[in-house]
Amino acid sequence: MVSIVLGSQWGDEGKGKITDMLSQDATLCCRAAGGHNAGHTIVHEDVTYDFHILPSGLVSPKCINLIGAGTVFHVPSFFKELAAIEAKGLKGAAQRIFVSDRAHVCFDLHSVVDGLEEKGLGGRKVGTTGKGIGPCYSDKAARRGVRVGEILDEETFERKLRTLDTSYRTRFGDLAYDVEEEIARFKEYRNLLKPHIVDQLEFLQEHKNSPNTLVEGANALMLDLDHGTYPFVTSSSTGLGGAVQALALNPASIKSVIGVVKAYTTRVGSGPFPSEQLNGDGEKLQQVGREFGVTTGRRRRCGWLDLVLCRYSHAINHYTALNLTKLDILDDFDEIKVGVAYILPDGKRTTGTFPADPNVVDKIQVEYVTLPGWKSNTMGVKRYEDLPPNARAYIEFIEREIGGVPVKWIGTGPARDHMIARD
């Protein structure tokens, strides 16, 4: 049976920890979308690991891991990240990681183009990570991309990469990029990659009787190309539908869809953010929560929990359970606000829909409910009944407001065991 972990906001919700926990019983862990633009941190046996392109199921020695067809694959980052986690003690990780031959290759060329495209937008920048993700997915959609399996065919690979280089030079002129240098690097990568590249369908059929398959979402629903705050989104399908498509999942095999919700809201980069707090509360959330991006180091924008957004996310991803993270960051607030409705520019009140037009979203007025804080330390609490009454009331308010979806896990700190599991 399949469990899927998905971000419900704008990313950085803390998906890695629940994935790490669930991977202990998983025999297969898969990434379905995104690339090395994703980022999360796992603290495992007092060692901190930063994951980007690799599935975090690698922390479990019995878990096989797949980077699936919906991803974009930056080869240097793959080997760098693999070496880094093995150097920290995850021995044998290289023998447990595979990549679909249908994933697309993200080149250094794409990163150069990403920067040029962002520069061309001027004040309307999307705020990308600069990793080349958007240009790579653009090449995929335009049917000119290079797939991982083609790396093994030297002649085809080099022809297609040179064609990409020529097409981008036609568009932008001279580039700070040497295609022959990249081709030379791949001559070294080719044999190193070969043991990791698999026919995805064949690979998944070999594991179809896996009692516990875990799908690890990247980014989050509000960064989804179709359902997110377009154009301030990533370039892939980050929700439930994207996971099913990328991994050819049988929907009947899905036993749980876990939405990861930060106890407040953050986003990196540009774009609408209705509950953002450009005040002392936002500053406090940023400082106490240490809200800096794992991938870029950029400071995250912070605001109160937005339940309109969460209801919208649930309506698309159909969560069966929630993991509420970073509850402890709210410990020192006298009062905690929660967004429960939007007042649209035309005066209409909505509680579960998110407008498609970013100009409309920018003019939304958020209706808040103010709840009492608990003013006591929850870090490391491991039993629900040991939480302060007001903290439990906060959690139960969220459950009611998101249609009764149970909050089954509650994060109370950065360590792997700083998690409450409710029956």
Swiss-Prot record:
Its main location: cytoplasm. It comes from the Eukaryota. InterPro entries: Adenylosuccin_syn_GTP-bd, Adenylosuccin_syn_Lys_AS, Adenylosuccinate_synth_dom1, Adenylosuccinate_synth_dom2, Adenylosuccinate_synth_dom3, Adenylosuccinate_synthetase, P-loop_NTPase. Gene3D superfamilies: Adenylosuccinate Synthetase, subunit A, domain 1, Adenylosuccinate Synthetase, subunit A, domain 2, Adenylosuccinate Synthetase, subunit A, domain 3. One of its GO terms (cellular component) is cytoplasm. It catalyses: IMP + L-aspartate + GTP = N(6)-(1,2-dicarboxyethyl)-AMP + GDP + phosphate + 2 H(+). Belongs to the adenylosuccinate synthetase family. This is Adenylosuccinate synthetase.
